[in-house]
Amino acid sequence: MRCLYLDVGYTCFINTQTSILNTINMKILILDNYDSFTYNLVHYVEDITGKLPDVYRNDEISVDEIKNYDAIILSPGPGIPDEAGILKETIKTYAGRIPIFGVCLGLQAITEVFGGEIENLNDVFHGVATEMKVIQNNTVTFKNIPETFEAARYHSWIASRNNFPEELEITAIDEDGSIMALRHKEFAIEAVQFHPESILTPDGKKMIQNFIAFAESQKPKA
């Protein structure tokens, strides 16, 4: 039995799905930024790998304790990155050492860590799906994803194009040209502003699968 947050509330069902990448043996951390969608990410990772990831809230684990993980997923969350416990310090510490995938607040934190800014929107997005456009095809996140796709949005902040960090690259935008996804040019860091774990993002699980498969490929060979 599992329960997912399906945009209109929690729905529980029996899981009979086998894992997609059942040969993967990884230690995956989901850093929970106190968001109701975090456990959708958890269940996606379980479906993909056949194993539950570790989940810690951003004030329940130390930065040092993260060092032995093979991949880090930064969950969505309320507020701004500076209010999210060890979120930004985790990115600073493990950038270039452990593959990182950020969702919503996670993208905003990555932007700030590398010297960028976030800006407050005049119109808040809450539980709506809008069209996204991939503008960089050779990314981990969007491998085998259509150039345009629908994705769920729950946010009032975005990464600003003003003073956008040279180290980062915009990989997807919305219809207004706002930043909807990015990656680091050198490190294994990618992030999305939308919610891949929402039922309103049909290709979302594939995006997370892409990240996990890539992170697994970066593990040192025994």
PLM regions: where:
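C-terminal and late-domain segments of enzyme folds
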Residues: E169-I173, G177-A222
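N-terminal beta1-alpha1 cap of cysteine-dependent amidohydrolase-like domains
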Residues: G9-I14, S19-G96, L105, P202-A222
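Catalytic beta-strand/loop cores that center a nucleophilic Ser/Cys/Thr
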Residues: N138-E186
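Cysteine-nucleophile active-site neighborhood
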Residues: Y69-T139, N144, E150, I208-N210
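Histidine-centered divalent metal-coordination motifs
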Residues: C104, H155, H195
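Short hydrophobic targeting helices and cationic amphipathic motifs
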Residues: L4-L6
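Generic structural signal for residues in well-ordered beta-strands
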Residues: L52-V55, I118, I170
